[in-house]
Amino acid sequence: MQDFWHAASAQLESELTPQQFKTWIKPLTPLSFDEQACTLRIAAPNRFKLDWVKSQFSGRIQSLACDYWEATVDVQFVLDPSAGQRQAALQPALAPVPMQPLGAQAGQPRQAMPAGNGVSHDAATLRPAPSVYRETALATASHAAADIDVPVMDAAEVSARSYRMPPQAPAVVATLAAPPQAHVDDSVHERSRLNQILTFDNFVTGKANQLARAAAIQVANNPGKSYNPLYLYGGVGLGKTHLIHAIGNFMLMENPRARIRYIHAEQYVSDVVKAYQRKAFDDFKRYYHSLDLLLIDDIQFFSGKNRTQEEFFYAFEALIANRAQVIITSDTYPKEITGIDDRLISRFDSGLTVAIEPPELEMRVAILMKKAQAENVTVPEEVAFFVAKHLRSNVRELEGALRKILAYSNFHGKEITIEVTREALKDLLTVQNRQISVENIQKTCADFYNIKVADMYSKKRPANIARPRQIAMYLAKELTQKSLPEIGELFGGRDHTTVLHAVRKIADERTKDAQLNHELHVLEQTLKG
């Protein structure tokens, strides 16, 4: 039996993502194999994992068992007999804990979002700027800052402006070179408007955001030298802002004199208006054109703001020419933003464009556990799975749910259990359960790909029908709580292995095919309203 489980685990590990294998397969324990009855019993550590493994992986495990023993094997999944003892041992740790604002460290107040800053990335390449520029900048920056939301630069910052030669862009790396542990003064974060809390260390990575994180790490290590601009897009609360703050914080740790500015697009529009009203636009342009890193959030707010777009275009051109890094976020793909000048759209497309997708189940669980850990609160794993299974859209929704659970537990003096969680989130869960159905997914995909809804259930296999059907199966798996057999039944009584094949095929191709990824993003946004 142990030989079988070793071989089966190795096979499943090769088929699943590392996070899926670690979450679902590794915790399983083979209990016994009855040769006469040809029955294999496998234990799961808790009820949630038991139910999920039975619905998602039982067919594959049974297939492996039948191949191994060359017979029809009945695989039975049961709750680990020792699970109750472990749960009892954990009870003292699950007592309610006084609430803190989510995101604050124990014993520390929540940090406010800071404000704009100063100079170059690579100290070895620094050389003084011309004195005329230095004197003019110092004389005018103070005046500008009084009326416009632009920080003042001191003489050392201005004179340290770097001029970089254009190097060849290196390939994406998935590791982050550790910056020297330089002390970064709070005033630097204040001027840059970087949130010190948002770093790579506390960014939870999964299949949905791994490419975006890899690109962000590459840019942090090689600002202005690789992907420029870096354009991150995705729905609300998926981590775009976290990633760009992480890049800025990494650069500041590496060089506290780096001239960095994080700004929301709406604030940039406001600053442009103020600059014209105060007749201080030369100062405004001088500041923005001299940055080493510009992080601009939610660029879609430039829509219809023609004057702002024109000024941003010139700032963008100046920064790129100086090999300064530009990072942009938006809620949609560049070419889908309405009311933006074609010149800007083409500039956004000239760098690297990366989508951040809604987090998958395992990633949502990891996010919840990490947020709870930051609050010094113990949340049982099965509770995290319960919440993650029902709330699928974004990280902020998960954070909000965790706040409600902690508040409910604290106010009522109850331990955090699935029953308490269900009661705390009853309104939210009711709304979620009304949302996306497989039938709605089928209709949306049929309309999108111009086929009949009936084709979703038919046995027809032409590529123009089979492909949309596979995409609909993938979305049904990602966006609903249906099991593979249930999805198969709703697609004309297909076997769960057919659904599994479609899900894996589309998930794999999505990471390689930009057009498919874009189509899926549009469908997901449409279904979520």
From Swiss-Prot:
It comes from the Bacteria. PROSITE patterns: DNAA. The keyword ATP-binding applies. Residues 193-409 are annotated as: Domain III, AAA+ region. Its main location: cytoplasm. Keywords: ATP-binding, Cytoplasm, DNA replication, DNA-binding, Lipid-binding, Nucleotide-binding. GO terms for molecular function: ATP binding; ATP hydrolysis activity; DNA replication origin binding; lipid binding. Residues 1-72 are annotated as: Domain I, interacts with DnaA modulators. GO terms for cellular component: cytoplasm; plasma membrane. Residues 410-529 are annotated as: Domain IV, binds dsDNA. InterPro entries: AAA+_ATPase, Chromosome_initiator_DnaA, Chromosome_initiator_DnaA-like, Chromosome_initiator_DnaA_CS, DnaA_C, DnaA_dom, DnaA_N_dom, DnaA_N_sf. ATP binds at residues 237, 239-241. SMART domains: AAA (SM00382), Bac_DnaA_C (SM00760). It is found in: Cytoplasm. One of its GO terms (biological process) is regulation of DNA replication. The keyword Protease does not apply. Residues 72-192 are annotated as: Domain II. Oligomerizes as a right-handed, spiral filament on DNA at oriC. Domain I is involved in oligomerization and binding regulators, domain II is flexibile and of varying length in different bacteria, domain III forms the AAA+ region, while domain IV binds dsDNA. Plays an essential role in the initiation and regulation of chromosomal replication. ATP-DnaA binds to the origin of replication (oriC) to initiate formation of the DNA replication initiation complex once per cell cycle. Binds the DnaA box (a 9 base pair repeat at the origin) and separates the double-stranded (ds)DNA. Forms a right-handed helical filament on oriC DNA; dsDNA binds to the exterior of the filament while single-stranded (ss)DNA is stabiized in the filament's interior. Belongs to the DnaA family. HAMAP family: DnaA_bact. This is Chromosomal replication initiator protein DnaA. It comes from Ralstonia pickettii (strain 12J). The gene is dnaA.
